[in-house]
Structure formats: structure tokens, C-alpha cells
Amino acid sequence: MKTPEYLAPLREELAAALKQADNAWSFDIFKHTPKLESFTKECLRVFTPSGKKPLQLRSTGRTLSPGTKFSLPAQQAHLDPDNYPNPNIFDGYRFCDPQSGACDIRGTITPSAKWLIFGIGTSACPARLLATRISQTLFFKVLRKYDLRLKLDNGQPEVVYAATNMFVNFNTQMYVKSASI
């Protein structure tokens, strides 16, 4: 994990949320995880998945030739200093309200010109809430069971690109051990 300083606070938040839910996993658990909400949105902002897909746009009266590639400038919007202060610095609590500590799921799943992670307009992903909650649940399950640390020589994982997609080098190694919760 590139930002291990978030592991302990997120684990604590998970433990408290589970306690409030009598240790039962449910959708309601996310009402008590504002740090996770902000952390998720910051991960999506900084590590924007992007790609290019062939498409014909008949609904707009325009037709792109089959095989024409296009993409939204999501990463450019997410790293624009006019949209986000200090955009190149990962801040897992960027989207938490400084006074209340709250972070609303609507900020993560509502498309806008500044937030393009799930597309925008009529083409926005209809399963964005489900995708977000599944990702968060999987993250919490791993976080609850394991301590993770990247095995790095220089402190930063190598990034590789395939077309317009960015990935951590698949040969990057991790140390994994059972968590002590």
C-alpha cells in the first residue's frame, strides 16, 4: 500500500462501524465510515482508471467511424488545481468535512465536470453506487484480515501504462501477514 498511514485509522473506523452494527455486515455500515468514503474518492481521483473505447454516437446525430477512440479527460480534471487544491498530493481525508468529519457518498457517485470517474451525463455508469460499495467492502475485508506493505527499493511503486491505463507494475511485491485486530 502506497499510503500505509491510513491503515490504522481506517481499521479503527471499520471496527467502530462494525460494533455499531453488532458485527453484522450490511449496507448501513457505510453510514459510519466517512474516512473510508473520503479515502475511496481520493483513490479514484488520484488513480483515475481511464481507457478508450470504440463507439458510434447515433443518439447525438453524429457517427464516429467504428474503431475511433475517445476518452474523457478524467485524470486532467482530477489533477487540475482549479478543481482540487494540491492535486498531486494524495490526501485520503480530502473529502471529509473538517468540522464534522462527515463525507457523503453522493460526492463520490454524482458525476460533474470536476468528477468524471464514472462518466457524465446520460452515459454515466448506472452501477456507480454498487461498484463503489463493492470496492469498499472488499477493501475493508482485506484491511480487517491482513497487514500489507509494498516491498520497494525506492519507496514508490513503478507505474506502467497500457494505452491510457495506468497500473502498478505487476511484478511489484508485497509483504502480507495476518492483521492483529
Swiss-Prot record:
GO terms for biological process: secondary metabolic process. Its EC number is 1.-.-.-. Disruption phenotype: Abolishes the production of ditryptophenaline but leads to the accumulation of cyclo-N-methylphenylalanyltryptophenyl. Keywords: Heme, Iron, Metal-binding, Monooxygenase, Oxidoreductase. Transmembrane segments: none annotated. It comes from the Eukaryota. One of its GO terms (molecular function) is oxidoreductase activity, acting on paired donors, with incorporation or reduction of molecular oxygen. Disulfide bonds: none annotated. InterPro entries: Cyt_P450, Cyt_P450_E_grp-IV, Cyt_P450_sf. Pathway: Alkaloid biosynthesis; Secondary metabolite biosynthesis. Belongs to the cytochrome P450 family. This is Cytochrome P450 monooxygenase dtpC. It comes from Aspergillus flavus (strain ATCC 200026 / FGSC A1120 / IAM 13836 / NRRL 3357 / JCM 12722 / SRRC 167). The gene is dtpC.
